[in-house]
């Protein structure tokens, strides 16, 4: 996924790169909302929106209304998820998506990008419908166990870069609930 995302980013021609999965659905106004936000907040380097889930019948459920930017919360879990948008210059400056974090490559990227971003923005609207398929992380955070380990590594790297002395672990309640970190 990391290499494919980086290859796709090389082909893109705009000032911003939006990340979304091929089987998910953007709202009709998603890109317009992103453009409006960036025009009103020109220092924005990283941007995310609220989202919900969509099943095979097209029924939407489980809306995720996210808080505004919180660096402390992002160290706790990947609350950005979908829709995420980054300024191309920042994407290139930090080396894009790192290989070796598959399953949590987006989390690792978000941690690194927000460390360097001038402004991290939140559009408090559902702009993304995350498709729930059997065996996907949209259905369960423990559907892909390797994503947990990759997420732990991403946070360990982040606290090391920030010179924070801490132990990174997945809480028991998250393990028991089938959640990520």
Provide a role label for each language-model segment:
Residues 1-12:
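Glycine-rich, basic loop-to-helix element that forms the pyrophosphate-binding segment
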Residues 13-14, 80-95, 132:
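Conserved nucleotide-sugar donor-binding
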Residues 17:
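Short aromatic/hydrophobic "clamp" motif used to bind/position activated sugar donors
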Residues 25, 29-61, 133:
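Conserved donor NDP-sugar-binding/catalytic core segment of glycosyltransferases
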Residues 46, 55, 85-86, 103-104, ...:
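Conserved active-site beta-strand element of glycosyltransferases/polysaccharide synthases
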Residues 56-79, 92:
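Short, flexible, basic/aromatic active-site loop/helix in glycosyltransferases
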Residues 95-111, 146:
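Donor nucleotide-sugar recognition loop
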Residues 99-101, 111-130, 135, 154-175, ...:
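Catalytic donor-sugar/metal-binding loop of nucleotide-sugar-dependent glycosyltransferases
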């Amino acid at each position: 996924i990391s290499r494919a995302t980086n290859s796709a980013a090389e082909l893109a021609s705009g000032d911003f790169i939006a990340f979304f999965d091929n089987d998910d659905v953007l709202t009709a106004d998603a890109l317009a909302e992103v453009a409006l936000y960036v025009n009103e907040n020109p220092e924005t380097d990283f941007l995310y929106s609220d989202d919900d889930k969509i099943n095979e019948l097209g029924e939407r459920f489980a809306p995720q209304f996210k808080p505004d930017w919180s660096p402390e919360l992002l160290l706790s879990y990947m609350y950005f998820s979908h829709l995420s948008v980054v300024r191309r210059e920042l994407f290139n400056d930090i080396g894009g998506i790192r290989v070796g974090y598959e399953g949590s490559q987006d989390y690792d990227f978000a941690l690194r990008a927000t460390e360097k971003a001038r402004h991290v923005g939140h559009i408090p609207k559902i702009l993304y419908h995350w498709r729930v398929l059997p065996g996907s992380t949209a259905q369960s955070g423990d559907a892909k166990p390797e994503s947990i380990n990759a997420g732990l590594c991403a946070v360990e790297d982040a606290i090391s870069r920030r010179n924070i002395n801490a132990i990174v672990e997945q809480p028991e309640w998250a393990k028991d609930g089938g959640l990520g970190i």
